[in-house]
């Protein structure tokens, strides 16, 4: 049995790893053309709801995360099955629903532009019908040591600071750096 020493908010956690299912990965889900979709609370809250559902029903384990305006970073794994399958199902469902949310949002000033961009991207990808919300791939990076785990969690948490959204990582609402974050992570 292998162990990972996971440090979150200066606390060290011990987690056993099974090479087939419990490897920790740094993953990124990116909106097509880097479109800034996650500027509205309702879209962010929808992502939180779906990540929470996947934690409960698909055994998605999230150790750190941040929702930026056009991408999501996570340190994650799954208890059962394939992380790629879980993320693929998450992306398929959220793609359809977010597209509908944007299309039906009369308050969305960029609605027509975003819908056209997603439809255009979908037209050129044979894997899609009608539109493409997420870029293909999750860009998984295996986190093979405690130092790499710490580096990726630090990178995730400092992303909103580097973007100029907040002065300190713990101030960003949609991040595991915030102790009151709406998404509960494994600690």
State where each predicted segment sits:
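Short catalytic/metal-binding and nucleic-acid-binding patches
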Residues: 1-187
């Amino acid at each position: 049995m292998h162990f990972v020493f996971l440090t979150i908010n200066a606390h060290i956690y011990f987690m056993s790893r099974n090479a087939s299912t419990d490897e920790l990965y740094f993953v990124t889900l990116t909106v097509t053309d880097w479109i800034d979709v996650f500027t509205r609370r309702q879209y962010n809250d929808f992502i939180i709801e779906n990540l929470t559902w996947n934690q409960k029903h698909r055994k998605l384990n999230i150790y750190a995360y941040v929702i930026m305006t056009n991408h999501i970073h996570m340190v994650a794994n799954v208890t059962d099955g394939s992380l790629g399958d879980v993320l693929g199902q998450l992306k398929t469902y959220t793609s359809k629903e977010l597209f509908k949310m944007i299309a039906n949002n009369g308050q969305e000033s960029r609605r027509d532009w975003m819908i056209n961009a997603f439809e255009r991207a979908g037209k050129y990808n044979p894997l899609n019908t009608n539109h493409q919300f997420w870029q293909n791939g999750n860009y998984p990076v295996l986190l093979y040591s405690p130092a790499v785990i710490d580096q990726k969690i630090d990178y995730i948490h400092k992303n909103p600071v580097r973007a100029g959204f907040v002065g300190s990582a713990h101030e960003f609402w949609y991040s595991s750096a915030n102790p009151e974050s709406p998404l509960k992570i494994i600690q």
